[in-house]
């Protein structure tokens, strides 16, 4: 029996690598963000120590994004090219996510069986499938996965005080910071702070006979006993967050985002724009919505109280503009800059340990015994089949969503365009792609030619772009007179931007 939990994890890893490793060859290049990260990787592969990239927006600094994932793709590209590096990092992300969920679940539930179930369920998590196969957010996946690996180390440092856990927790946190800037900042609030609260609860529990005997004075005494360790970790973590991506903070200070907010579906009112509600709320939560009462009931028990508060906050923030609450909490500036689907992603990840616990109890534990006794084994199996069908059905639907509702134009043959730009010194002039979608990043990665447009909107500095609520110039047609006016500024005076060629796929 001792090997069973490890067998669950091994099964999860094998299924995850095969399922996602096979799937990404059909989905990853058609996602929103994957090719953008490939473009950044191309920059590091060509000019590792150059902080500026001149391919987009008449020049921008790559210091506006933590470099680890991009640099990893760049290094791997030396073996098999940029796409090889991108696919390899994606598979590494899958492995890190599954093992991260296992360790996080083991920390929360203290049950290797439940953690094993959580790891298997993580493979088919609709929020993870969407993040990887629809959004292509590789840094987010790597960042949150490493953060989950860091949580047990942080807990062990707080409860045991052993220096090796202090060093491992900070090392993993440093990797998280270098992977994705938003994850450690909000991870401190939504994951690490609740973890500290749970550690204090466990410390208080050692001084009493039962959890019911933990009162506020008992909790407060335990808090002060761990205070030195918390302060040591907090100061060190803050130091790492600042130092590890210091160029990012300097760039943020010198070049704050002042552009007109670009609309994003995660900020919509999901009751009015149901398509946004489907993509940014129903799909990532999936079948987990049916089990929300169980998750809140468990997380609002005394030991997990702070995780319950965190889950509540994440759930509310993930509703976007459906209610005014997220905007009140975040403030106008953060609300208009952040994409709020990240909160739903983190919320769905936070409940995975309890989802694994529920699945274990339902498949092998007390829930199975109760249902089999009350209703009979047949009804238990039917109910299990329905739940499994809904869960896997949501996964398959999410995986194939782009087939029903394409988010990108059909794949474009870049070779003729690349050949044209690379011959007769055409690359000395700027070009403007229209109707390319996110494939603009793949085109830019294959040529030295520059474009007035781009696909990393936070880096834009041209007033002609920052004064309009459009992502790329090709989207100007959707913004009426305002959008067309932005495009006209480039087409009527192209010499101002050294613009000579327009490639239209629209």
Model-identified regions with their sequence ranges:
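Membrane-embedded transmembrane-helix bundle of lipid-linked glycan/lipid transferases
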Residues: 1-421, 442-447, 456, 493, ...
